[in-house]
């Protein structure tokens, strides 16, 4: 076999670059004056491009956001009544609510007596009613209303917390210490106007008999008090009806219609009805269902329309 030529023995035998040398060459190439693969002019062009691009993008976003905010009214909801998520029915709610850690619960459970654990519920109700106690009726937006004295336009009716009586007060621990707990029911929906029953003949067949009788007495005694969204609360099942005992409603057996509609008048506070359970049995949980009654309120237990549910247990 012929010997290789002397020059061929040294082809490709030069020293190889190390990884560090290769990296340094990428960062700065002195032969081409490139920094990380680009010349100074190339870096200037791409920097100017992205500055202009992101400036235009931010300006477009700001412009769209400004146009969007022009469509909003921070005092009036865009979707109301039947167009809203909750529909045309007003919402019923109750207080006190269970702790935030039990967000899915509707159970009010406590041990009454001096050594009881009722303090949380009393504190919760005290906090809820604090705005009612601190707000006076001397403001320009407020007026004292009555069944024959509706509010003036642009003003809200003042709800006097003293109407809740002597039993459902923080001084009396809202009845929890004595085993006669109070629960507050509220009814509200923006822009909703109640269509009340003008006579006892208009009430539905499924209205509880005791409320029907009460409305008849009101109609006979003082018909102006018919201007009311009525409220009924009772045990949800036959067994609950037996265990629930007596319920006292204050200040009314419902919500005076002159408090509605709610139109976001500054300082408006929704009216409440205080329920006092006077004869609960120890260790017995009771399912309570409250319903609101008016011509334009639909009631459906499955969808919780026109009603609110909670449980109460005293130990």
Curated annotation (Swiss-Prot):
Residues 69-315 are extracellular. The keyword Ion transport applies. One of its GO terms (molecular function) is ATPase activator activity. Disulfide bonds join 145-157, 168-182, 233-290. PROSITE patterns: ATPASE_NA_K_BETA_1 (PS00390). Keywords: Cell membrane, Disulfide bond, Glycoprotein, Ion transport, Membrane, Potassium, Potassium transport, Signal-anchor, Sodium, Sodium transport, Sodium/potassium transport, Transmembrane, Transmembrane helix, Transport. GO terms for biological process: intracellular potassium ion homeostasis; intracellular sodium ion homeostasis; potassium ion import across plasma membrane; sodium ion export across plasma membrane. The sodium/potassium-transporting ATPase is composed of a catalytic alpha subunit, an auxiliary non-catalytic beta subunit and an additional regulatory subunit. This is Sodium/potassium-transporting ATPase subunit beta.
């Amino acid at each position: 076999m012929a010997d290789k030529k002397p020059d061929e023995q040294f082809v490709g035998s030069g020293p190889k670059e190390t990884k560090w040398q290769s990296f340094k060459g990428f960062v700065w190439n002195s032969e081409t004056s490139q920094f990380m693969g680009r010349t100074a002019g190339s870096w200037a062009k791409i920097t100017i491009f992205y500055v202009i691009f992101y400036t235009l993008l931010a300006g477009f976003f700001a412009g769209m956001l400004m146009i969007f905010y022009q469509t909003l009214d921070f005092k009036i909801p865009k979707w109301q009544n039947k167009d809203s998520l909750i529909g045309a029915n007003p919402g019923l709610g109750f207080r006190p609510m269970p702790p935030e850690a039990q967000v899915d619960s509707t159970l009010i459970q406590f041990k009454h007596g001096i050594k009881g654990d009722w303090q949380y519920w009393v504190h919760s109700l005290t906090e809820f009613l604090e705005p009612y106690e601190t707000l006076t009726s001397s403001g320009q937006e407020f007026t004292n209303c009555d069944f024959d004295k509706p509010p003036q336009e642009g003003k809200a009716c003042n709800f006097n917390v003293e109407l809740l009586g002597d039993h459902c007060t923080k001084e009396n621990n809202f009845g929890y210490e004595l085993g006669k707990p109070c629960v507050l029911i509220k009814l509200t929906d923006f822009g909703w106007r109640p269509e009340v029953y003008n006579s006892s003949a208009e009430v539905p067949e499924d209205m509880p008999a005791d409320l029907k009788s009460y409305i008849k007495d009101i109609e006979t005694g003082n018909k102006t008090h018919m201007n009311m969204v009525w409220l009924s609360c009772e045990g949800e099942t036959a067994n609950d009806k037996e265990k629930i005992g007596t319920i006292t409603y204050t200040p009314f057996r419902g919500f005076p219609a002159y408090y509605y509609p709610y139109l976001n008048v500054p300082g408006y506070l929704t009216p409440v009805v205080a329920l006092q359970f006077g004869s609960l049995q120890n260790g017995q949980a009771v399912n309570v269902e409250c319903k609101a009654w008016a011509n334009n309120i639909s009631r459906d237990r499955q969808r919780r329309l026109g009603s609110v549910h909670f449980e109460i247990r005293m130990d």
